[in-house]
Amino acid sequence: GLSRSDRVALRARERALTLSGFRLLDSHLYLRPDNLVGHAAAARDRLYKLGLDSNAPVFSVRDLDPERERLARTLWQGDKLNASYRQGRIKLQAWIEHADQLDLDVAARESFLLGNDAIRQLVYDPLLSEPLVDVRERRAFTDVVRHYDQVGRDIWRRQLAQLSQQPAMPVALTP
């Protein structure tokens, strides 16, 4: 098996590539669409900051052969991403609509859990462009997450204010 340091480096590489939307095309070639501001240079900087070995080459690829081009287009499941944007948006909107009916402690707990899921989805989103994903649906999801964040912050401000007003419970210390 791999040594401990090799496993740590492998995990760092996989995490950096995944967080940046790269997918494995063949044995040693990871790629992503070149649709981000800054192109390969910005991707390289981000990957290195996220833990990719600084000796790993990061470059732009053009003119893949037809078979690799076909395979490359199958690496991201755009339909699944679109569905996750839509489902996430609907779930958060529904929660926002009834959040004021929840007890404050329940609302705080749920806002934390749902918010965690939404943030994770945003962090791991590969930020693909049309036609791979529905960019409007992703934008709608992101807009709802921003609104949800404001609602959640308000809930947590009230929750923390309420907690700070409660007297501390005495604790009996036994020797």
Question: Where are the language model's segments positioned?
Answer:
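Mid-protein regulatory/catalytic core that forms ligand/cofactor-binding pockets
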Residues: 3-95
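Short, hydrophobic/proline-enriched secondary-structure or compact coil segments at domain edges
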Residues: 1-2, 119
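C-terminal regulatory/effector modules of DNA-binding transcriptional regulators
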Residues: 66-175
